[in-house]
């Protein structure tokens, strides 16, 4: 008889899957395939949506969107040129940076307001370049006026000269160039003017000849004339300050007194011996080259030249330079404006 209780038999039975295993294996495999298929479909839809958004449309894409979402923009960004014509150029280009620049400047001025009560020579060497002006009117002492060099041009020479001035002082060439860079970030060259003052006419003529070797220059040279010098009464000084501050009501009589000139003898006018040189240019390139020429003269003759820079209220543009101005700004504000932003 066969021993049925013995489980160890000589014949090996083939392994047979249970009914439960056979039922669950096939559906799990199909479920994995379905999940993979759905994932692939979802990815394809996402790629199709992104590719459809990259198609160029009539609407211009701003620079912020182009930087944050480069996949949403095409390589050749086209802007609406109507936005950048006529007076709208500033509204969509450099004036966008004015608010940040002015806010930063006011912040630095408030930060270093403790230095405004000191004379210019006592300012710290670590003073930022942008805080070249102070919010308080300064008074020049009579003793310093007596020690003033007769060949000096203006009151800045009382405090310091180009040779002894720190690199961040208002008289330094570095501060002059810094102000030019700051203005060019906000405005174009048509409303920026460089002013040069000197008692040496030969030096002014040499600078004029050097500037004439630069293209697109507009130069105005002349000697300063002053009228008869008179002192104002204290009542006049107080009244005009009250008029500007608005501490008194603006009546017709007050306005008339504020704008009424002090009568003097016109025949007592005289030449003071100071030659002034005004420099304008239609483009930033030309005016920057002129600024470097002025800086070189100021470094070689530190005690004979005073440099200044002014922001005009309206553009100074000649008829001969209109085409140059338009062609230069066309590359910045119209055709390649989107590419330059990136």
Swiss-Prot record:
Similarity remark: Belongs to the herpesviridae U84 family.
Taxonomic source organism: Human herpesvirus 6B (strain Z29)
A biological process term (GO) from this entry: regulation of DNA-templated transcription
Originating gene: U84
Lineage start: Viruses, Duplodnaviria, Heunggongvirae, Peploviricota, Herviviricetes
Protein name listed in UniProt: Protein U84
UniProt biased composition (Basic residues): 14-25
Location of the region described as Disordered in the Swiss-Prot/TrEMBL record: 1-37
Pfam family, one: Herpes_IE2_3
């Amino acid at each position: 008889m066969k021993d049925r209780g013995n489980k160890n038999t000589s014949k090996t039975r083939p392994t047979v899957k249970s009914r439960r295993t056979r039922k669950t294996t096939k559906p799990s495999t199909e479920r994995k395939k379905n999940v993979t298929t759905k994932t692939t479909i979802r990815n394809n839809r996402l790629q199709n949506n992104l590719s459809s958004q990259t198609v160029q449309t009539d609407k211009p894409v701003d620079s912020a969107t182009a930087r944050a979402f480069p996949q949403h923009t095409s390589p050749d960004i086209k802007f609406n040129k109507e936005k950048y014509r006529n007076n709208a150029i500033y509204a969509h280009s450099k004036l966008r940076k004015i608010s940040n620049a002015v806010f930063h400047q006011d912040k630095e001025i408030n930060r270093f307001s403790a230095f405004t009560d000191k004379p210019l020579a006592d300012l710290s060497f670590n003073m930022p370049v942008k805080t070249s002006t102070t919010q308080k009117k300064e008074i020049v002492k009579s003793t310093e006026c007596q020690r003033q060099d007769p060949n000096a041009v203006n009151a800045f020479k009382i405090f310091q000269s180009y040779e002894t001035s720190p690199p961040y002082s208002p008289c330094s060439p570095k501060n002059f160039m810094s102000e030019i860079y700051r203005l060019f970030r906000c405005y174009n060259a048509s409303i920026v003017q460089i002013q040069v003052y000197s008692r040496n006419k030969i030096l002014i003529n040499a600078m004029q000849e050097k500037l004439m070797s630069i293209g697109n220059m507009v130069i105005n040279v002349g000697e300063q004339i002053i009228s008869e010098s008179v002192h104002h009464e204290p009542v006049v000084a107080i009244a005009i300050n009250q008029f500007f501050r608005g501490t008194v009501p603006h009546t017709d009589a007050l306005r008339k007194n504020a704008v009424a000139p002090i009568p003097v003898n016109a025949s007592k006018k005289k030449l003071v011996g100071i030659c002034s040189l005004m420099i304008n240019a239609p483009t930033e390139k030309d005016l920057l080259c002129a600024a470097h020429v002025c800086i070189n003269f100021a470094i070689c003759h530190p005690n004979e030249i005073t440099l200044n820079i002014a922001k005009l209220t309206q553009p100074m543009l000649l008829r001969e330079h209109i085409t140059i101005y338009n062609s230069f700004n066309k590359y910045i504000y119209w055709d390649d404006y989107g590419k330059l932003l990136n």
